[in-house]
Amino acid sequence: MDLRYIRNNIHIKEEDQQRIKDFPVLIGGCGIGSYIAECLLRMGFENLTIADGDVVELTNLNRQNYTNKDIGVKKAIVLRDRLHAINPEANITVFPEFINQDNLHEIDLNHKVAINALDFSSDIPFVFDQYMAKKNIPVVHPYNLGWAGFLTVLPPEGLNLQSLEKAHETFELNVGKFIADSLRAKDIDAKWFEEFLAEYGKIALISPPPQLSLGLYILSGMVSHIVFNLATIKPVKFFPASYYLSMMS
């Protein structure tokens, strides 16, 4: 095994370590995607494409993989440099533009899995999912719940997030209802999350969902595990099934 990954030994078989090295992953969105990208790289995924046209802002620093000196610089550029500082030999492709209907086709889609960490301030995340489905690429949807991580995986064929009940004006609240319903169906105490949704509902029209670094750290591990399972052809649950991890009762 490559000396860089020798401490992965036993946890990851040598043949799987080699498999994930060349497994191409697309990360759409370098906010939540910033720590996911680093976690994947440190595991051994060395073929990553990161796409985002946003710049680092002060309000990102409570949770995203950036520092004060990065403010004003494009996230994709900063993240590429950080990833190359970790592994200079990694193949990090950058698309430092906001993804839209006109440029999505410009991204080289020789990928095996996509991570949709785009902001739901428009319909672009849905366009992203539809485009990946046409290319037969499964899509991982991660959600930072503050004190928890939640994700679901969309298969190329089957239900997608547009099938969610549209009970609220903002998509984030509709996803929140889906998450709360999913937790209750598994007999998981969702009271803390329901209380959060009630408070967030008061500001949802003017603010994106509040998030914590803790939730993103949890989520990065969850997403990386799912991508590893996809890469090594291990079992994965697909939407509407989901994954949740938290220490909240």
Short names for language-model regions:
Residues 102-110:
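Short amphipathic alpha-helix with an adjacent loop that forms part of the alpha/beta core around
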Residues 156, 219-237:
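Oxidoreductase and adenylate-handling cofactor-binding alpha/beta cores
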Residues 25-29, 50:
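Hydrophobic Val/Ile/Leu positions in short beta-strands of Rossmann-like dinucleotide-binding domains
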Residues 1-26, 58:
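N-terminal charged helix/coil linker that caps or initiates catalytic domains
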